[in-house]
Amino acid sequence: MSSFNSNSNPANAQNLSSFQFQPPKEDVIFDTHQMSLSVPQSRYYASSMMQQSQQGQPQSQTSQQQQQQPFLMNIPPAFTQTQPQQMLYAMPPLQTQQPSSSSATTNNVVPPHHYNQQQSQQQQQQQQQYQQMQPQPNNMQFFDNTIPNYLIMNQTISPSQTQTTAQPNISYYNYSTQPQLQSAQPISHSQPQPQPQATQPRSNRSRSQTSFSKPRGSRQVSGSGRSTGAKKQSAITSGSTGTGPARNADTGMTSVANSTSTTTMTTTNNNNKLSVSAPVNVIYANLPERLQQVLPAPPLSRAPVRPDVTVNLTSKRAKRKSKFTPEQDDMIVNLKKKGKSWVEIAEITGVGSYLAARNRFQVIVGQQGNNNSSAWDNTDKLFLNQLLDAGEIEKWRFICCELNKSTNKNFTDYECREMIRQLFWLNPASFGVNEETIIESQKEKKLTEKTIEQREQQRKKRASANHSPPDSDSITNTNNNQQEVKYIDPQYKNYQSQLMPNQNTGSGATKISSTTPPPPSQALSNNVNTMNKNIVSSALGGTSFSQEQHSLHSNQHHHNHQQHPLIHHHQYQQQSSLPPPPTIPSTIPTSSLSIQQQQQQQQQQLYNKQFY
C-alpha cells in the first residue's frame, strides 16, 4: 500500500473529475462497503499480452466476454458461444483475505525495493484501466482467484451492490497474488500435465493459480497470428490475450516471468527424460534378488572362467630369439624382489644400462610387450579360481579378528557375516552397489558366455580338422561352463558318480541316472547272472537277495524309462545313494566269478570318474 504516490501526475489530472482517489493510510483495511479506501492494484503480464491488449481494444465487448468466460468460469464451450453472460465476482470477506495475503507474503516474499522501482508503472496501469472501463460502466468485472466458487448472474450489478456505496469502475485485483506470479519457484507438478478443460470445476486456489501462471511461457510461442482453432483452444486454456483490462508491465518483469516458466518447463522435461531412461544412481526394488540372478552362485570354484581371448589356439608365430638368457631373466626378477635398484641390477646381470634391465623386467612380468609372456596364463587364472572359496572364509575370519581388536569384544565370523548381510539388504547403496552394478554384471556375464562359446567352437573346428583329442585347457573351460552341476562334499567322493548328474552337452539338459545303461549283450548276461544269484541266495538263505534284485530291477526300469528321467528323479536318487552291496560268496564257481567280475567292473566305473 505504501507504493501509492500521492504526488501530482499529469496522467491522473484528466480523470480526477469522475473519481477522486484518497491518499491511503498505512493501516487501511479492505471493506466491501468502502471501496473508495482500497487502492486498485495491478498484475504483471507478459510483453506479448501487453501488445495484444493494445491491439485488441477496438474489439467488441461480446467477443471479450466469450473469450474470458471459459478461462474463468465453469461454462461449456457451447454455452459460451450462444449465451454470452457477464460475470460478477463477490468481494472476499475480511477473515478470508487476511490469511491468504499473509500466507502469500510468507511463502513468496518479493524484496521491498522491487515495488519501489515500479511505482510509476503501477500508476500508469491504474489510469489506463480506469480509462478503458469508464466508457462501459455497466460491464464491470472483478477478478479475484482467491474465491473458489464464482457467481454467474444475468444482471450486471447485483441488488446488494446497488444498495451500497457507488463503487469505482476499476477492476479489483487481489494484491496477495502478485508475489506468486512474480516468484521464480518451480511448479509443484513433477510432470507437465495437459491444461484442464473448461468443463472441469476449478474448486482449488492452487489449481486456478497454477493454470493461471502456466501459459506465461506459451504465449510468446503462439504469437499474435493464430488460426481459428488455435484461438479457441487458447481461449479455453489460457483465456483472452487481447481483451479485458489493459495488461501492461515492464520488460524486466516480463523477462522474469517468461524465464521462470521456461525454466520450469525445461526442468520438468528433463526429469521426464531421466525417468524414461532408468538412472543408474537410483536403487529399485528387489535389488539383492536381481543381483543374485546375475552373479555366480557359490562355490566360486565352479564359476565359469573367461578364457583368455589373446591366447591363440592355432599355430603360434615364430618368436625371435631373445638376447637375454634365462639365467639373466631369473636374476633380474630375484634382484628386483630383494629391492635392488635398476643400476645395481644392470651391473650384476651384465645386461647393459639400467633401462635395459627395467624394460626386460617389465617384459617378463607382462607390463609391456605383446602380453604373450608366461607371467600370467590360464593356469594361474584357474588356480586363483580354486582359491576363491578358501579366501572368502579367511576374509571373514580376518574381519572378525580386526573387529574383536577394535571393540574388545568376542565376535564370530558367522555373526559378522550375518550382520553385514542385514546391513546390505537394508541399504545396498551404502556398500556402493546400485543399478550400475547390475548393468556391469550383466555385461560381464554375457561377455564370459560369448567368449566361452567362441572358444568351444574353435576347439571343435580344430578337433574336426586335426582328428585329435582336445587339449586340457579347453576341457577345463568346458567343465567350468557347466553351471548346473551340484556341489558335492569331498567326503562323499566314493559315490560321486551316483550323485552327480550326467551332462548332456547337446541339449544342455541334465539327466539323473544311477549308472549308464548296459548294451543289449550285457543286459542278457545280467539276466543270466540274476538267475544264478537267485539260486545262490536261495541255497544260502541270505537276506541280500531282495536288495540285489531291487537294485537290478531299478537299473532295468531306468533303462526302459530313459526318455523320462525327471519323473523318477527322487526315486533313483534315494536308490543310488546306497553303498554298493557286499560281495556274496558262492558255492558255484562259474556264477561267483561272473558276479565278482561284474562288481569289479562297476566299482572301477564308479571310482575312475574325475570329480573336479
Curated annotation (Swiss-Prot):
UniProtKB keywords: Cell adhesion
GO biological process, one term: cell-cell adhesion
Compositionally biased region (Polar residues): 230-240, 465-480, 497-512
Record keyword Cell membrane present: no
Keyword Flavoprotein among record annotations: no
Biased composition (Low complexity): 1-18, 47-68, 94-106, 115-141, 182-203, 218-228, 254-272, 585-606
Source domain of life: Eukaryota
Region (Disordered): 1-20, 46-68, 94-143, 179-273, 443-480, 497-527, 546-612
Biased composition (Basic and acidic residues): 443-457
Ranges annotated as biased composition (Basic residues): 555-571
Coiled coil: none
Function: Surface antigen mediating adhesion and aggregation in S.cerevisiae.
Protein name as it appears in the record: Adherence factor
Species name: Candida albicans (strain SC5314 / ATCC MYA-2876) (Yeast)
Gene (UniProt): ADF1
